[in-house]
């Protein structure tokens, strides 16, 4: 049985890796550092950093801090967080992902131009909370691309200027499905023909451009991170190429759930674990009279490579025969 470890489409994305690198450097310098929320949605990595001196605080804990150093993670934060930090004399180490920072600016500018903001994403996701803060927490947040949840449309004004954006880790097909459904919904409510929403670029929404160019009433900007979304097809193909797939991610990881579902759709014998204690020996038993010849190990953008290696080594040592190798 061969163990295939995916090193090209698994492991930290650039944004998360940057946060981890800065956290490690700060911990070496200071000995202790507070993180506002889990530094990454991976419990195993959080515990590793906590052993180095990282202290995770929630909303209540953050508000009680003063005269100390706090890490802002890659997901980003709303403006209110920085206001509290200034009031409490907190030294902020800001590791907001550059992709998220640009999206926050886009959201803020669109709101200033009078657009009601629709975010394709998950209401409780920290990135979405940060985005919503850029527009005074007035955004409509829609998770269901088919508009199956009427509550998500409460407060929507179909005749008003509207801009659709997305949480960076959502799926591309879902975003465009939502756009099409919103176009049809607006036309139906307004009693008009379907009006395609116009794609915009960052340059289109700067203050200077808006003075010389009329902005359309309905616009959208595909803000899904391509470094993340490009992994979809690669992990799909990786899953097809192996008899069994062990997908490693934190249970809180939004990206992990998306990628796991992609792997599972490609290969029904895909199993989700957070750590090696959850591995079931039956996964590697013969299936329909055929022995398992290959096991693929992959994970989310929030899964550290060292942990994927740990899982691969464990499966090799415990379940593979003596002739197996870890293929890279």
From Swiss-Prot:
Q: Which cofactor does it need?
A: [4Fe-4S] cluster
E.C. code: 1.17.7.4
Binding positions (dimethylallyl diphosphate): 41, 75, 125, 253-255, 302
Which is one GO molecular function term here? Answer: 4 iron, 4 sulfur cluster binding
- Annotated active site: 127
Describe cofactor binding as the record notes it: Binds 1 [4Fe-4S] cluster per subunit.
According to the UniProt record, what class of enzyme is this? Answer: oxidoreductase
**Family, similarity comment:** Belongs to the IspH family.
Descriptive protein name: 4-hydroxy-3-methylbut-2-enyl diphosphate reductase
The organism named in the record is Chlorobium chlorochromatii (strain CaD3)
């Amino acid at each position: 049985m061969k163990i295939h470890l995916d090193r090209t489409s698994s492991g930290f994305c650039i944004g998360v890796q940057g946060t981890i690198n800065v956290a490690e450097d700060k911990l070496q310098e200071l000995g202790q550092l507070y993180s506002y929320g889990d530094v990454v949605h991976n419990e195993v990595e959080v515990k590793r950093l906590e052993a180095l001196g990282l202290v995770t605080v929630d909303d209540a804990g953050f508000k009680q801090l003063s005269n100390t150093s706090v890490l802002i993670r890659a997901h980003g934060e709303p403006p209110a967080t920085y206001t509290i930090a200034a009031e409490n004399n907190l030294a902020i180490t800001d590791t907001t992902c550059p992709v998220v920072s640009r999206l926050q600016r886009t959201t803020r500018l669109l709101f200033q131009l009078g657009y009601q903001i629709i975010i394709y994403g998950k209401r409780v996701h920290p990135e979405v909370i940060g985005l919503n803060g850029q527009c005074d927490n007035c955004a409509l947040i829609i998770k269901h691309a088919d508009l199956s949840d009427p509550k998500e449309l409460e407060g929507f004004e179909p005749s008003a200027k509207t801009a659709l954006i997305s949480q960076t880790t959502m799926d591309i097909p879902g975003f465009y499905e939502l756009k099409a459904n919103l176009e049809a919904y607006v036309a139906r409510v307004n009693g008009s023909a379907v009006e395609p929403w116009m794609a915009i670029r960052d340059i289109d929404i700067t203050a200077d451009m808006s003075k010389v160019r009329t902005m359309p009433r309905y616009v959208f900007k595909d803000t899904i991170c391509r470094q993340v979304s490009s992994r979809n097809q690669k992990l799909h193909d990786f899953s097809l190429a192996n008899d069994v797939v062990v997908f490693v991610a934190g249970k809180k990881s939004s990206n992990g759930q998306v990628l796991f579902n992609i792997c599972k759709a490609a290969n029904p014998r895909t199993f989700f674990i957070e750590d090696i204690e959850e591995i079931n020996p039956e996964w590697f038993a013969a299936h329909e009279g055929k022995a398992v010849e290959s096991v693929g190990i992959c994970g989310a953008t929030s899964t550290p490579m060292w942990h994927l290696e740990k899982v691969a080594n464990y499966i090799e040592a415990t379940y593979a025969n003596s002739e197996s190798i870890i293929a890279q």
